[in-house]
A protein has these predicted regions:
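Secreted/periplasmic proteins
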Residues: 2-189
Length: 189
């Protein structure tokens, strides 16, 4: 009887330890490590391709993130190109204001962890690339958890370090939109 109890106790301990380490491994405070919390199975669909997005592929697994690297005065990120206009590759209306935005507006979407459940909605952030800096307003989330559906233009979830910017931001920074991705730094204003 004591052996059965001991085995049950060890089994429960191992189950709890494994669950805790899995949860803790997705973000380790102080270390700034953000790891995938799961994987989304891909589903292809009608992906609008005006800004040459990556479109989901059936059966491919895409990492999901509930976290992003810590924000500093010079947070490293990847700038991607996105249209926030209706019918373009941005999908539905912006989450912050339930509206679409002109490609001439200085607006961005941030990865899920940086978006912080809408806490950065309406805030301006400073974006720096190639020695140039601009300010843009946060209007949307670049969803790092969900994707491969109509609401997300059949695009995979964003990586955890994305600043998805309008063509106006790219132009103001003097960047080539045809590249589609650029290393940047950003910070809260």
């Amino acid at each position: 009887m004591a052996t059965a109890r001991a085995l049950a106790t060890v089994a429960i301990f191992l189950l709890v330890a494994h669950s805790t380490s899995h949860i803790a491994s997705s973000l380790r405070p102080g270390l700034g490590v953000c790891r995938a919390s799961g994987y989304l199975p891909g589903k292809s669909g009608n992906c609008e391709k005006s800004n040459d997005p990556d479109c989901c592929e059936d059966g491919k697994r895409y990492p999901q993130y509930h976290c992003s690297p810590p924000v500093t005065a010079t947070t490293k990120a990847v700038l991607t190109l996105n249209s926030f206009e209706k019918g373009k590759d941005g999908g539905g209306p912006s989450e912050c204001d339930n509206a679409y935005h002109s490609d001439k507006e200085m607006v961005v979407a941030l990865s899920t962890g940086w978006f912080k459940n809408m806490a950065r909605c309406g805030h301006r952030i400073k974006i720096t690339a190639n020695g140039n800096s601009v300010y843009a307003k946060v209007v949307d989330e670049c969803d790092s958890v969900y994707g491969c559906d109509e609401d997300h233009n059949y695009e995979p979830p964003c990586a955890n370090n994305i600043v998805d910017a309008s063509p106006a931001v790219w132009n103001a920074l003097g960047l080539d939109e045809n590249v589609g991705m650029e290393g940047i730094t950003w910070s809260d204003e």
